Every structure is written in C-alpha cells, then in structure tokens.
C-alpha cells in the first residue's frame, strides 16, 4: 500500500507524493502560450496548507470543500514559493466533501526565507565579482597616470639631474656655432668696422704708393 505524505513533510524536489487534502480556495485561471489553462488552488490537511497547480479540465472540476486524494504528485519551487503539482501518470480523485480536519497554518507556500537566502548569496557573489573586476580596471588607470608622470618627469624632472635637459641644448649649440662660422664667411664685411679699416688702409697705401 502507498504511504500518505502530510503537507508539512513536503520538500522541494520530492516525487511520487500521495496526499489527501481538502480544497480551501480555487484561484483564477491563467492561460499558457500553448493554450492550456492553469489554476492554482489552496489545499490543506491537519498539518498545514499548500498551493497546488492544476491544469485544464481538472481545475474546472475542483470546488472549495472537496476532499481529494493526490497520487504521484511532486513538489517544486515556483517564484520562491513551494508548490504541489500532479506528475506524469498522477491523478486527482475526489473522495469526499467538507468532513475533514485541516489547518490553514502554517502555509508552506508562503515565500520561504531559505529560498531567498539561497538566491541572495548568489547575487552577493556576483556583486563581489563585479567590484573585483572593477578594481583591476582602476589599477591600469592608476598605472596610466604613472606613465603620464614618467612622461612629465622626462620633460620636467630631469632639470633636477641637470644633465638631462642640457644634452638637448648642447645639440642646439653646435648648429649655432655653425651659423656663427657661416656668418664670418658671409660677413667679412659684417664686421667691416674693425677689419675693413686695415684693408682700406692697405688699399689706400697701395693707391698712394701707385700714385
């Protein structure tokens, strides 16, 4: 003979559940994309209440106050709430009405903090991984200003060592010397004041001597 399970003993993932319960409420019908009608009903036994999801015509036949035997059901979590389903080959059979001892509390289909805490750490882990990923990004950004500082040091800091800025100036000096060298070549007349006088004097003496 099959053993009956109480509502209080239902856990997520259990299969082949056999229960006897009374229907307390029938919920609104919702249609799936496939055109099926789904109705959520609140049922209870003496240990507590739970929601059961019923499909199509069976949901239309169930009425509050019906005492039903469920065979081969299974339990799963839907939107954070424990829900009872009819499995493959399962059956819902009406065995009576009204005359059954039941308790609405505790309601095992209420959102369970254990399920939320199981989801919360996962989100926390993701949040932890995100800042860790953001930290390395800040690292290279800190390195980039360092490189900028190095570039700035290459230009401004070497004045401390002195030798750094001077080499660029030293190559600038040789061209200036070249220019000065070219200037005397082109400007023997440029400094004519001192040099032209003796030259002119020589010419004058030559002219005077020729005369």
UniProtKB/Swiss-Prot annotation:
Any one biological process term the GO annotation gives: positive regulation of telomere capping
State the post-translational modifications: Phosphorylated by ATM in response to DNA damage. Phosphorylation prevents degradation by the proteasome, hence stabilization of the protein and accumulation within cells. Ubiquitinated in a FBXL5-dependent manner, leading to proteasomal degradation.
| This protein's record includes keyword Nucleotide-binding | no
- Residue numbers spanned by region Disordered: 110-211
Composition-biased stretches, type Polar residues, lie in 114-154
Keywords (alphabetical) are:
DNA damage, DNA repair, DNA-binding, Nucleus, Phosphoprotein, Ubl conjugation
CDD domains in the cross-refs: SoSSB_OBF (cd04491)
Predominantly, its location class is nucleus
Which SUPFAM superfamilies would you find in this protein's record? Nucleic acid-binding proteins
Subcellular localization, as worded in the UniProt entry: Nucleus
A Gene Ontology cellular component where this protein is annotated is: chromosome, telomeric region
Pro residues bias: start-end ranges? 158-174
Q: Which InterPro entries match?
A: NA-bd_OB-fold, SOSS-B, Ssb-like_OB
The record's annotation in Gene3D superfamilies points to: Nucleic acid-binding proteins
The GO terms this record gives for MF are: DNA binding; DNA polymerase binding; G-rich strand telomeric DNA binding; single-stranded DNA binding
* Pfam families the record matches: Ssb-like_OB
Q: Which residues carry this modification: Phosphothreonine?
A: 117
Classify the source by domain of life.
Eukaryota
Subunit structure and binding partners: Component of the SOSS complex, composed of SOSS-B (SOSS-B1/NABP2 or SOSS-B2/NABP1), SOSS-A/INTS3 and SOSS-C/INIP. SOSS complexes containing SOSS-B1/NABP2 are more abundant than complexes containing SOSS-B2/NABP1. Directly interacts with ATM, SOSS-A/INTS3 and RAD51. Interacts with INTS7.
Per the record, the similarity remark reads: Belongs to the SOSS-B family. SOSS-B1 subfamily.
Query: What does the UniProt record say this protein does?
Result: Component of the SOSS complex, a multiprotein complex that functions downstream of the MRN complex to promote DNA repair and G2/M checkpoint. In the SOSS complex, acts as a sensor of single-stranded DNA that binds to single-stranded DNA, in particular to polypyrimidines. The SOSS complex associates with DNA lesions and influences diverse endpoints in the cellular DNA damage response including cell-cycle checkpoint activation, recombinational repair and maintenance of genomic stability.
In Swiss-Prot or TrEMBL terms, this protein is called: SOSS complex subunit B1
């Amino acid at each position: 003979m099959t053993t009956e399970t109480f509502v209080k003993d239902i856990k997520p993932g259990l299969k082949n559940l056999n229960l006897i319960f009374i229907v307390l409420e029938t919920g609104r019908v919702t249609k799936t994309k496939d055109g099926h009608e789904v109705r959520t009903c609140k049922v209870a036994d003496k240990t507590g209440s739970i929601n059961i999801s019923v499909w199509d015509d069976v949901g239309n036949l169930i009425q509050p106050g019906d005492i039903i035997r469920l065979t081969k059901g299974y339990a799963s979590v839907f939107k954070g709430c424990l829900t009872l389903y009819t499995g493959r080959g399962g059956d819902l059979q009406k065995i009576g009405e009204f005359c059954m001892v039941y308790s609405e509390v505790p309601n095992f289909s209420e959102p369970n903090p254990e399920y939320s805490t199981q989801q919360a750490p996962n989100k926390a882990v993701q949040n932890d991984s995100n800042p860790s990923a953001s930290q390395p990004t800040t690292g290279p950004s800190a390195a980039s200003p360092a490189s900028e500082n190095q570039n700035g040091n290459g230009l401004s800091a070497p004045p401390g060592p002195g030798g750094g800025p001077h080499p660029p100036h030293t190559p600038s000096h040789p061209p200036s010397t070249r220019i000065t060298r070219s200037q005397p070549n082109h400007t023997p007349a440029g400094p004519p004041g001192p040099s032209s006088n003796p030259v002119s004097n020589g010419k004058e003496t030559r002219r005077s001597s020729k005369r």
